[in-house]
Amino acid sequence: ALRRADLCFTCARSEAPGRVQALLRETVLADARVLPQPEPFARLTGVTDRALEFTVRAWCRSEDYWALYYDLTQRITETMAEHRIPSPAVRVTTDAPSGKEGTSQ
């Protein structure tokens, strides 16, 4: 039996989508547990105001699923760091009580 591992990754919107897709695909294909058919999928699947969202899909034998899932998660994260692909910027907003803006107590 076969299973499909689905993973999602984000990066800063300033990155070139083609570059990120190529790195994702290269990382997935480097793992011998990933089956060549159905062909692995690594594509830009969403855009937000701060991020590009990518989906990775790879088929494997059922007995390899969990190890592959966790290993791909780690390897892709490491590959993105090695190639200095930044995570999306995090915006933090705070609300101050009425009349207290800019003060601390």
Predicted feature residues:
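Short glycine-/aliphatic-rich beta-strand segments at the starts of folded cytosolic domains
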Residues: A1-R13
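Solvent-exposed, non-transmembrane regulatory segments of membrane-associated proteins
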Residues: C11-E15, Q21, R25, L29, ...
